[in-house]
UniProtKB/Swiss-Prot annotation:
Annotated binding of a ubiquinone, by residue: 201
Signal peptide (UniProt feature, chain positions): none
Protein name: Cytochrome b
Record keywords: Electron transport, Heme, Iron, Membrane, Metal-binding, Mitochondrion, Mitochondrion inner membrane, Respiratory chain, Transmembrane, Transmembrane helix, Transport, Ubiquinone
Disulfide bonds: none
Any one Gene Ontology cellular component term annotated for this protein: mitochondrial inner membrane
Subunit structure: The cytochrome bc1 complex contains 3 respiratory subunits (MT-CYB, CYC1 and UQCRFS1), 2 core proteins (UQCRC1 and UQCRC2) and probably 6 low-molecular weight proteins.
Segments crossing the lipid bilayer: 33-53, 77-98, 113-133, 178-198, 226-246, 288-308, 320-340, 347-367
Cofactor dependency: heme b
Source species of the chain: Acipenser persicus (Persian sturgeon)
Entry superkingdom: Eukaryota
Binding-site positions, heme b b566: 97, 196
Family: Belongs to the cytochrome b family.
Length: 380
């Protein structure tokens, strides 16, 4: 008799995705981040659910309800710290996952890649509306500044902003709808992740060589289920260590002050994982131009498959492209640093230079290097 996991209508889907899935035998630790992102999402949904049981989405009580969670709810401080720092770990895994896709040419699986970019945008939206919920100073002013950017759109801008605010400023209506979005979006992300996996399993995983690995596949379980488990343990140890030893390391001290529309913080800045995009936004002295650059800084990822000029898939055997890839990583670190600095000389100039380099690498340098490497190998 056939095994139930291969015949049961539901179990055979799980079996095909997580147990008997044919997997390239040589995928490295860089392929762990997909499952780590799944773990992050589950952690965030569970901790978020328990926080939502005690949180009140009203401007008069939101800040106090978060304080109440940390002081009076059993292990509320731990749930909140895991949720807040879990977001940081989520984005670390996201950026590493995207970087892996860029380095090894995984973006040539276009459907998987494009759903991945949409997932990145959804996660960024979720994190943004979530940051507003504690209703501290940086929550309020971050919401005001970022939503205000939509007013840059010609003709409909002002109407659009007031529609999102639910009034003439960031107020109670804004907070309640942001809570609704923050509750809903993670489930949308979970659904989109399933589509992401569905597309991935149509083609199978890429591998570090970029070559076809059909001749050398192994079952996902036990080989990679245990390899993923090691990643799970390492990440959970890291997350709990941060949550227990330095929970406010990555937060902004301004958010310990309740929101006050009459007092603007000296430096309005988002959480660290948005600083690179914030630096690109600020480096353009025109409002609409800045907003478009901000959008394009993420959407440029959708152009990467179309700009692939090399006859090889990954960067494994392409030293020039490797140099450019690491230049892009360094550039993003520079942008992250600049995003957290005040708008004054020399930071403005460095930000503009780094933003130019960011787009030049994506749109000009990487495609040209691919052509150059083809020429060097007489593959043109």
């Amino acid at each position: 008799m056939a095994n139930i996991r291969k015949t049961h209508p539901l179990l055979k889907i799980i079996n095909g995705a997580f147990i008997d899935l044919p997997t390239p035998s040589n995928i490295s630790v860089w392929w762990n981040f997909g499952s780590l992102l799944g773990l992050c999402l589950v952690t965030q949904i569970l901790t978020g659910l328990f926080l939502a049981m005690h949180y009140t989405a009203d401007i008069s009580t939101a800040f106090s309800s978060v304080a109440h969670i940390c002081r009076d709810v059993n292990y509320g401080w731990l749930i909140r710290n895991i949720h807040a720092n879990g977001a940081s770990f989520f984005f670390i895994c996201l950026y590493l996952h995207v970087a892996r896709g860029m380095y090894y040419g995984s973006y040539l699986q276009k459907e998987t890649w494009n759903i991945g970019v949409i997932l990145l945008l959804l996660t960024m939206m979720t994190a943004f509306v979530g940051y507003v919920l504690p209703w501290g100073q940086m929550s309020f002013w971050g919401a005001t500044v970022i939503t205000n950017l939509l007013s840059a759109f010609p003709y409909i801008g002002d109407t659009l902003v007031q529609w999102i605010w639910g009034g003439f400023s960031v107020d109670n209506a804004t907070l309640t709808r942001f809570f609704a979005f923050h509750f809903l979006l993670p489930f949308v992300i979970a659904g989109a992740s399933m589509i992401h996996l569905l597309f991935l399993h149509q083609t199978g995983s890429n591998n570090p060589t970029g070559l076809n690995s059909d001749a050398d596949k192994v079952t996902f379980h036990p080989y990679f289920s245990y390899k993923d488990l090691l990643g799970f343990i390492l990440m959970l140890v890291g997350l709990t260590s941060v949550a227990l030893f330095s929970p406010n390391l990555l937060g902004d001290p301004d958010n310990f002050t309740p929101a006050n529309p009459l007092v603007t913080p000296p430096h309005i800045k988002p959480e660290w994982y948005f600083l690179f995009a914030y630096a690109i936004l600020r480096s353009i002295p025109n409002k609409l131009g800045g907003v478009l650059a901000l959008l394009f800084s993420i959407l440029v990822l959708m152009l990467v498959p179309m700009l692939h000029t090399s006859k090889q898939r990954g960067n494994t055997f392409r030293p020039l492209s490797q140099i450019l890839f690491w230049a892009l990583v360094a550039d993003m670190l520079v942008l992250t640093w600049i995003g957290g600095q005040p708008v004054e000389h020399p930071f403005v100039l460095i930000g503009q230079a780094a933003s130019t380099v960011y787009f030049a690498l994506f749109l000009i340098a990487l495609p040209l290097t691919g052509l150059l490497e083809n020429k060097a190998l007489n593959w043109n």
